[in-house]
Each structure stands twice: as structure tokens, then as C-alpha cells.
Amino acid sequence: MQAFDELLTVEQLSFSYEEDEKPVFQDISFELQKGECVLLLGPSGCGKSSLALCLNGLYPEACDGIQSGHVFLFQKPVTDAETSETITQHAGVVFQDPDQQFCMLTVEDEIAFGLENLQIPKEEMTEKINAVLEKLRITHLKEKMISTLSGGQKQKVALACILAMEPELIILDEPTSLLDPFSAREFVHLMKDLQREKGFSLLVIEHQLDEWAPWIERTIVLDKSGKKALDGLTKNLFQHEAETLKKLGIAIPKVCHLQEKLSMPFTLSKEMLFKEPIPAGHVKKKKAPSGESVLEVSSLSFARGQQAIFKDISFSLREGSLTALVGPNGTGKSTLLSVLASLMKPQSGKILLYDQPLQKYKEKELRKRMGFVFQNPEHQFVTDTVYDELLFGQKANAETEKKAQHLLQRFGLAHLADHHPFAISQGQKRRLSVATMLMHDVKVLLLDEPTFGQDARTAAECMEMIQRIKAEGTAVLMITHDMELVSSYADSVLVLHDTGLAFDGSPAQLFSQETGLVQKAKLTLPLLYEWMAFQEEVRDEATVTSH
């Protein structure tokens, strides 16, 4: 590790939302130096996001929480009046849910808001706004209404707001979770370049570690109770503490997982892995789904004003199948799900559920047959407790209560049964939103990023639950940015690109035969397919050289 000067000091920090509750996290102590980059890992619900908000002084004041211990920024307590007034200039947080930090209508005004608070002159402000938009490649969003942006675009805007103020410390809370795979990789490389150029300190909370782990030297790990479990060099932790990390529900970088599976030497570098020959028999073929068609979509189009979001889309969902819906940010994937769920009206086209148009179904009947999990789970919560959320709209009897208890246990939410749905972590909210849909025996299940915000263990449990639902005959359509998940679980893939449906086929066909489309649609190849493509390029180069 390099030698740094002290920037942030955390001493025996604990935090809880209510006086009689056990702490969300407890007894956390560490130092963060100027220019240092650190990964903050831990299972879903262990207090990572709450810790981030304590570090820049938003908590406990913003939530009437209870905090003990100390946080020092430049050796001054962040709770000091003088420090708290200027802290956003020194320590910026990009929230897990970007909507929570926006207060203006347009992108330009949102970035300007923070700069105005720093009393930046107007001419300089305009230069800073244009520079940061160009740096993040979102200049085309400058005059857009924030409410019209996709989740991934909002996340980039939130980062732009922080970068424009040039803080000494940037805290990123799952910054790539809403980005398409190409944009996520691009984002990480951008942060790497920016950090080296500007020299700011960086604290990253993340579940997807493949792009971060090779260059962020230090990692801090929290356990389920919110205590610090590990703190050390990233390479050492993944090499020597992999089993401990897995037990905590932390996703091991895919390169580590693959080399362990293939009994190969340890490395965090996929470039090193790709130099080795691929063992035979590691790409398994799947049978095409053979169930009857449940949902038929024909020539479906949707527009906002004069702007076409998607047009002339046709596909079908079959009983007992899992279809992945993928594509770049802003292509209308979430909008398509809303149209399929009859929450938005299409401009043209037909949607048939069991050969009957959606509009022929009564609302209550449609909801019993079709479940929809929103990208933002808070949009579907209507009760005051986690338990009541599961029972909402159900007949109160022993059978439904038993099913609710089973789902609480299955999704690791039993200890939160009496909590308000808005007071649990983002990962827990996501699990609750999926669980509520499983209270109904739906025939079609629409899922918008079901594993978003989940640690490795709960994401795997969520997918296994979806697999069981699929095995019972339900047709599942799932938006995801995780191509490894697509490769492992999906029976078929739909690729939305350039307002149309660019691909409808198997994952193996997409990743092995349509690599040009993978690149155009801002996807990434699963690691094994990327390895295969790399070795094919090497063979082609060798052939050209030999001639």
C-alpha cells in the first residue's frame, strides 16, 4: 500500500434508528487516508448504506437516529457546526437509490444546485457542468427532466452532481447496480481514471466486484450483525479468506470463482486467466422451453410524445420458462414491463394472456394471474409492516398466514416482520417485493432487476426461488444487467436495442454467435464466453501470422 495522509477517522461508531433497537452497525473503527481507495463489503442489511450516510454527516440528523462513537474529517468531528456546513464540499455520497438525492427538475439545474451552494460564479459553474457531463458521456441529458430518465441514467446524473463539486472523499453506494453491463464496466474504469487524475479518496459499497477488486487495494468487510469482520489487502482477503467471505454472503469475483472451479492458480486478473487453455465441457447446453404459450405480444409499440421508446415488438412467453430481458440503459425495458402489466397503455399492438386481450380482464383477476415486481420496490409498498405487506389483498386465514411466514423465513425477513417496509435496507426491500408477488399463484411473473441490492447468498436464494416458481409452470420475464445470471438461469433472452427487439433466442446463441450485437447493445460476455472469445482471437491472429 502507498503512504497517505489521514483524511477520515472512524472510532467505535455505532448507529441505530430507534433507542430500543439493536444497532444497525456497531463498534466500527478504521482510518481512510488521502487518495486511498477502499471497498466496503457485507451482507445485505448489515448497515453499509447507513454507515456511508454517517460518514458524511447526513445521519443521524436526517433520520433522528442514535449514534455513538466519532467520525473525524480532517481531524474535525463531522458533527461540528463549522464542519457540517461545508461537509458536502469535502465528502460526497452517491446514494443507492439516486431519486433520494434529487431536488430539482432538470439535469442541468440539479448539478447547478450543489455548485450554487458553494457560491461558484455562474460562468465557472457552466464550465464545470459541461465538463462533468462530457466526462460521464451524458451531455445529451443536460436539459432533460430527471423524472423521464432511466434508473441507470439517474445514477450517472447523481455522480455528476458529486464530481462537479470536486470533494476530497467520494462514497459510492452500489453505483453500478442500475447500469447496463458495458456502462458498468465503463463507469468503473472511469472512476479509476478520475481517482488517479484527481487524487480523491474513494469508498465503494458494492456487491458486484469483478471490475473493482483488481485495482482497489484495501477491503473492509462487515458481518451480518454490522461489526467489522475483516480489514486488509483485497488480494489477500479473496485468496485466503474466500470461505469466510462466502459464508457472509459476499460475491467472490467471477474470475476467482472460475479458477477455483477449474483448480487453477489464484489471480484477480482475468487477463492472466485467459492465458490458460479452457478445460473441455464447461459450456452446458439447455433445452429450449416447450410449454404452451401463456403471453403473446404482437407488434407492440410505445411512445412518449413524439419519441418512440420501442416499436413493433413481438415475442411470446411459455409456461415453465425464464426469459431474460436485456439491453442498454434507457431503451425502455422497465417501460415494456409496465405495458405488459397493463400499468401503461401501448400506442399500438396486442397483448394476449391465455389468448384473451389484457383489457378484457378485470383488474383483480389480472393481478391474480400476473405479478409485477417494480425496479424501485418502494413503489409497491402500501402497509406499515413487512408482514402486513405479504398479507395485503389476501384472505386472512391459517393457510395464507402460513405461506407468509414461510416466505419471510425463505427470504431472510422473519426478524423484520414488524418493521416498516420503508425502514429496511434496499436489499431487504427487494426481497420483500419479490416475496409479495409469490403470495399469489401467478401464471406470469414480471421482475424488474430482482437481484438488485442483494448479496451473493440472498441473490442465489432469490434465483432458486424463481426457478422453483418456473418449475411449477409460471412464465417468468426478468430484466437484468447480470449476464452471468442470464447464462446460468435463463432459457431464452430478449435484447432491446435501438427501439426494437434485436434478438430472441438462447443465451448460448447470443453469447457465442452474436458477439457484435452484445457489443452494440452494451452488454458484456459472461466470463467463460469472454475467455472463449479471447482464445479464438489468439488463434485467428496466429493463423494470420503463419500466413
Swiss-Prot record:
Its main location: membrane. GO terms for cellular component: ATP-binding cassette (ABC) transporter complex. It is found in: Cell membrane. It comes from the Bacteria. The keyword Zinc-finger does not apply. It is a peripheral membrane protein. The keyword Metal-binding does not apply. This is Putative HMP/thiamine import ATP-binding protein YkoD. The gene is ykoD.
